[in-house]
Amino acid sequence: MSKVTGSERVKRGMAEMQKGGVIMDVVNAEQAKIAEEAGAVAVMALERVPSDIRAAGGVARMANPKIVEEVMNAVSIPVMAKGRIGHITEARVLESMGVDYIDESEVLTPADEEYHLRKDTFTVPFVCGCRNLGEAARRIGEGAAMLRTKGEPGTGNIVEAVRHMRQVNSEVSRLTVMNDDEIMTEAKNIGAPYEVLKNIKENGKLPVVNFAAGGVATPQDAALMMELGADGVFVGSGIFKSEDPEKFAKAIVQATTHYQDYELIGRLAKELGIAMKGLDINDLSLEERMQERGW
């Protein structure tokens, strides 16, 4: 019996519905409810937020299915869950549980150092990280319905997310003025599917939404990423590692929606406590940088 797969149009359409919103990492039902009440458009169920994964070291795997199930039962908004890069069985288990999206995530320890998942063989849509157009196009070619910047998870430092968003956007702009021969050469140079690049050139944009992720810690960070062209924002450790998660969650949602209302963002920031402790990217070795995982 052949596997049933979801159509590309339906998967991408589901992701489009999250545009302009905030997706929050949660580790239990209580946090999921806080996220929903704050206005999150979806939650990401995982065992530990990225900052705790970074601190603990070792191997980071898919969350216990019990945690994912508790979160799914607690909220009415879509629930995402992370699986390891290339781990077919983790993804199939999450799909069988009925999660709304799977994040093939570099936050977890990769299971396969050669292959990402063939996401077009699944019914459930996938979100994947990217730092540049080559990574974005490869993930789209594999069937990703949604992209996000990799940033540097668990640091509370927005600099890498900014770098990745600007990089992808500038490469998309450059692609739009290329002729077919140049696109073929570009596909070879960056290891990207030609048809995906051709589609981007013809439409002047990526065929899927691209959210900001990795290092968002304040309402100002979220608004900045929207200014730079993000379709929405993922917040990992930034909310539940802050002094007042409920206030931070609501403020980040409002700042994402009203990202050019600087007076509002200033008022929101005044009412908040202390943000999560940040890490300087320069203090991390290449081996410690989660963004280096995947290819």
From Swiss-Prot:
Known catalytic reactions: aldehydo-D-ribose 5-phosphate + D-glyceraldehyde 3-phosphate + L-glutamine = pyridoxal 5'-phosphate + L-glutamate + phosphate + 3 H2O + H(+)
Cited CDD domains: pdxS
Keyword Amino-acid biosynthesis: no
E.C. numbers: 4.3.3.6
Pfam families in alphabetical order: SOR_SNZ
Keyword tags: Lyase, Pyridoxal phosphate, Schiff base
Lyase found in the keyword field: yes
Alphabetical GO biological process terms: amino acid metabolic process; pyridoxal phosphate biosynthetic process; pyridoxine biosynthetic process
Single annotated GO MF: pyridoxal 5'-phosphate synthase (glutamine hydrolysing) activity
Residue sites binding D-ribose 5-phosphate per the record: 25, 154, 215, 236-237
Residues engaged in binding D-glyceraldehyde 3-phosphate: 166
Active site, per annotation: 82
Role noted for this protein: Catalyzes the formation of pyridoxal 5'-phosphate from ribose 5-phosphate (RBP), glyceraldehyde 3-phosphate (G3P) and ammonia. The ammonia is provided by the PdxT subunit. Can also use ribulose 5-phosphate and dihydroxyacetone phosphate as substrates, resulting from enzyme-catalyzed isomerization of RBP and G3P, respectively.
PANTHER family recorded: PYRIDOXAL 5'-PHOSPHATE SYNTHASE SUBUNIT SNZ1-RELATED
Assembly and binders: In the presence of PdxT, forms a dodecamer of heterodimers.
Family to which the UniProt record says this protein belongs: Belongs to the PdxS/SNZ family.
Name of the molecule in the record: Pyridoxal 5'-phosphate synthase subunit PdxS
